[in-house]
């Protein structure tokens, strides 16, 4: 770098420019990786240098250091990432105490269970973008529920679990009890009401790992899921209800307000001794819901000395323009008091299924 050229720039601009570091290794990439104690991490550090790859590496290294210093991580999961087997990585992070709370859409949460009970019944269609509307209708009529390149086996998953959950809801109504959606689901594991698919690996189920570690799960907007729709139909008492159909009191289910109360207590307790980072996989309500926690504690509960989010890292491909973006970018979050000027932030504009495995591998020391 020509330092004379740099010195002509304004002080603020000079701070933004970094010198190209010396080569990180000697010899070939293959030789370096083969001799490394953590080969995946070694390969990542040698090759993920610029743009989204560089942002992914820097984010992973920051999170690794954050954990080393006693920090904790909240992970949020959007879309249908559980169907796309992100749970393989997330489950291991939970087992290794790298993730301490998960916020997931109702769909992602239930799909983790569906993978557990019906893994061998899933099917794929790699060239899904070439399907015609008529072919989509064929798939519908055959009972094949498509999520981009993946078919969810409804009969072998949803319909297997529904009777068990229905009985739990009915029993709760009789006793006047109410629980969170994830608490009802966890009883499927605890009471051994479901079994893993013979061709599935139970260790790949992040919801099972969260159950074993007893870490909190938050499900904002539970109604926006297959089982949430089913619960809504059981609690509906309007004109469309058929005579003799099962009716359940909706009060057996705790709501998003209850989840927010849970997060209040969790964050205040955990942040006393640990900075907490926010890793957002995709966008939507799974992330927008918990990110509001800190400003709500500050401005609504009037606890102004609450610790800010230590860092915010988002992986997603939705741009902030044209109304398609959900939430706010890292800097914009500062204006809402969701982040401070000292919070680490990084936006990785890429596919979660491509980037998250690298971050997970580095955090796991692979």
Where are these regions (language model features)?
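Glycine-rich phosphate/diphosphate-binding loops that line cofactor/substrate pockets in enzymes
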Residues: 59-73, 209-213, 265-275
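Short, solvent-exposed amphipathic alpha-helical segments in soluble enzyme
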Residues: 89-95, 233-237, 294-301, 328-332
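Ligand-binding beta-strand-loop-alpha-helix segment within the catalytic cores
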Residues: 135-226
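A generic, well-ordered mixed alpha/beta core segment in the N-terminal half of proteins
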Residues: 91-161
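N-terminal glycine-rich anion-binding loop in soluble enzyme alpha/beta folds
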Residues: 2-60, 64-67
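Glycine-rich anion-binding loop/nest that anchors nucleotide
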Residues: 73-82, 102, 218-222, 247-325
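Short acidic, glycine/serine/threonine-rich loops at helix termini
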Residues: 85-89, 113-119, 229-233, 290-293, ...
